[in-house]
Amino acid sequence: MFGKPDKMDVRCHSDAEAARVSKNAHKESRESKGAEGNLPAAFLKEPQGAFSASGAAEDCNKSKSNSAADPDYCRRILVRDAKGSIREIILPKGLDLDRPKRTRTSFTAEQLYRLEMEFQRCQYVVGRERTELARQLNLSETQVKVWFQNRRTKQKKDQGKDSELRSVVSETAATCSVLRLLEQGRLLSPPGLPALLPPCATGALGSALRGPSLPALGAGAAAGSAAAAAAAAPGPAGAASPHPPAVGGAPGPGPAGPGGLHAGAPAAGHSLFSLPVPSLLGSVASRLSSAPLTMAGSLAGNLQELSARYLSSSAFEPYSRTNNKEGAEKKALD
């Protein structure tokens, strides 16, 4: 009777000794993991199996102990990489590797048509309407709900693209308008004074604005003033003419003296509303002849200022550009 317990004790001691030896081997394998690359592969297989079993037990203990403290993670895996080192991989709680991949729903043409018509009518279909629509189309309510969510997202993206395209088009149009105004300003800038004046080949104004006939204009001004004085003088009967001289050379209906017809015709031909035109032209010509270069310089300066204002102003201020342009044109005319 005493021999059997001795054998049992020896067997238990041997089991305990084997467990202690395996633990020591496991500790030594963990301490010497830096030198595992120099050991043969046959020697590394046995500690790896022992470590995997102990690592699995440790993993279970960790998962059980940290389940309440760390609910965001559900699984910790110890793996050995290509270099032989042990690494720990923590998988998130939401990741389910065993779950099959969700299949993509394929709609028929009739289902898409009905869904699109309902979306054009109302972008949010809930409650009984969604249930009835899903029943009519032979779909689930989840499929109908997801389709409407995706359709609303697509519409928002399309609206964003359209607004961006409209902004680009408006900016392009504004840039073109600014460039057009700058081109007009460049074409209006003259090299000299004669480019600004209208081409008057004939007439008293053209002869006055051209510089070589200034002495003739002075003589014409004197003759015009004398003719106007003769027209205003009374006739031989001692009474003045009750009608003013007509414009365009037509003689007035009043009586004319011996020199009245000849005096009235030149006055009518060279006066505009009783104003002597040659004298006016003479004054204009004298001003132009006195400072033509100054006027051309001021015009060029105003046009350069106008171009600078177009460049510095925003493309979305048409009224301010119009006012600046009118002010510059008035300065140029003055």
Curated annotation (Swiss-Prot):
SMART domains: HOX (SM00389). It comes from Homo sapiens (Human). GO terms for biological process: astrocyte differentiation; axon guidance; brain development; camera-type eye development; central nervous system development; negative regulation of neuroblast proliferation; neuroblast proliferation; neuroepithelial cell differentiation. It holds the Pfam family Homeodomain. PANTHER family: HOMEOBOX PROTEIN EMX-RELATED (PTHR24339), VENTRAL ANTERIOR HOMEOBOX 1 (PTHR24339:SF32). This is Ventral anterior homeobox 1. Belongs to the EMX homeobox family. Keywords: Developmental protein, Disease variant, DNA-binding, Homeobox, Microphthalmia, Nucleus, Transcription, Transcription regulation. InterPro entries: EMX-VAX-Noto_Homeobox_TFs, HD, Homeobox_CS, Homeodomain-like_sf, HTH_motif. It is linked to Microphthalmia, syndromic, 11: A rare clinical entity including as main characteristics microphthalmia and small optic nerves, cleft lip and palate, absence of corpus callosum, hippocampal malformations, and absence of the pineal gland. Microphthalmia is a disorder of eye formation, ranging from small size of a single eye to complete bilateral absence of ocular tissues (anophthalmia). In many cases, microphthalmia/anophthalmia occurs in association with syndromes that include non-ocular abnormalities. Transcription factor that may function in dorsoventral specification of the forebrain. Required for axon guidance and major tract formation in the developing forebrain. May contribute to the differentiation of the neuroretina, pigmented epithelium and optic stalk. PROSITE patterns: HOMEOBOX_1, HOMEOBOX_2. The keyword Ribosomal protein does not apply. SUPFAM superfamilies: Homeodomain-like (SSF46689). Residues 1-41, 234-263, 314-334 are annotated as: Disordered. Its main location: nucleus. Changing R152S: In MCOPS11; loss of function mutation. GO terms for molecular function: chromatin DNA binding; DNA-binding transcription factor activity, RNA polymerase II-specific; DNA-binding transcription repressor activity, RNA polymerase II-specific; RNA polymerase II cis-regulatory region sequence-specific DNA binding; RNA polymerase II intronic transcription regulatory region sequence-specific DNA binding; sequence-specific double-stranded DNA binding. It comes from the Eukaryota. Residues 1-34, 323-334 have a biased composition (Basic and acidic residues). It is found in: Nucleus. Coiled coil: none annotated. GO terms for cellular component: chromatin; nucleus. Disulfide bonds: none annotated.
